[in-house]
Structure formats: structure tokens, C-alpha cells
Amino acid sequence: MALRTKNPNRQKTEAIESIKNDVKASSAFIFTEYRGLKVEQITELRKKLRENACTYKVVRNNFARIAFEDADIKDVDSWLTGPTALAMIAEDANLAAKTLFEYAKDAPALVIKGAVVDGEIYDAKQIEAFSKLPGKKDLIAMFMSTVNATTSKFVRTLQAIVDKGGAQGAAPAEAKAEAPASEEKAADTPAEQPAESAPEAAPEA
């Protein structure tokens, strides 16, 4: 009895559609060669990338080529040679690039060929330089630190103005408090007696 086998053309179509869907769902792609990596290493790398919203997928070059052509992404054919695995990134390409280059330090068999980030083409050197830049999370942290420092400085300046105004405001209050005392002292002092009238002149003879 002959075993039923899946239609190879259908398998091909499904594989291409799967890559197409991944391409549509991603904003960046990093092309790598995994020749020489062990299965457990690929599994470990996938796990690390998944933490950064990145899928690491081994692809057939001709299928990937069709998917990228369909998405109108050009100039990637030179990277679709040899054993190819794609890092397909939904969010922060910088974090995924950092992860790949950090992993490659301990696993030199992993080769980063190039990347497409937001429609821009990066060769191997450019994507490595990109990986060394601060990521979105780092930039947000730096921004918040600057905002907090500026706010703290503003609050201190405002408090200094308030404190200075309070010191100046105390002087008029003290002056007002002294005024009644002065008036009271003046009231206790007897008024000067009017000078005695000069004697009337004697009538002329």
C-alpha cells in the first residue's frame, strides 16, 4: 500500500508564505550564516533573541529570496548564500544586533552578513557599529535621567526663591510690629506746657 505524501509544491508554497508572513511582521532583518553551530547553540541563541521580540529562523535561500522580492526589499541576494538563518525583528533591532554580536564572541562560527533596518541596507561593519549604539531602552533611560535632573534643579531654584522672599518679607512685618511700641512711648511722654504769656504792658500815662 503506497503511503500518501504531502504535495511537494504545496510544501514549497507554504514555506514561502510562512517567510512572507514573517517578513511582513518584522521591521528589521539580520542575515547570518550558522555553519558550524551546534543544535544546542542555535537553540540557546533563539531563546536569547526571543527575549528581545526577535525570531531566529533557518531558511532556504531561494524561498527567502522570493519572500523579500514580494516585499520589495532589494539588495539582499548576496547574503542569501550558504546556510542562512534570519533574525527577524519586530521591535528593537539594536538589541537583537547586540545579542548576535555578543553571542558571536563566544561562538565565532556565527557569521553576521548584513541587515535591513527600517528599509535601510547595512553591511556587516555597519550593523556591528549600529549594535554598539544605545538602544531604545537606553535612550529612554538617559532621557528620563535628564528630565529628572532638570526637574530637581528647577525645584531647588524655586525653593531658593521662596526662601529668599520669606526672609525679605519678614523685615516689613518686624517694622509694623515696632510701630505701635513707638506710638505708645510717644503717648506716655507729657506734652510740653505752653510758654507763659508775657505781662501786659502798662498803660501809657
From Swiss-Prot:
Biased segments, Low complexity type: 169-180, 190-205
Entry keyword annotation includes Oxidoreductase: no
GO molecular function: large ribosomal subunit rRNA binding
Gene Ontology, cellular component aspect: ribonucleoprotein complex; ribosome
Protein family (similarity comment): Belongs to the universal ribosomal protein uL10 family.
UniProt function note: Forms part of the ribosomal stalk, playing a central role in the interaction of the ribosome with GTP-bound translation factors.
Protein name (database record): Large ribosomal subunit protein uL10
Species in which this protein is naturally found: Treponema denticola (strain ATCC 35405 / DSM 14222 / CIP 103919 / JCM 8153 / KCTC 15104)
Lineage: Bacteria, Pseudomonadati, Spirochaetota, Spirochaetia, Spirochaetales
Gene for this chain: rplJ
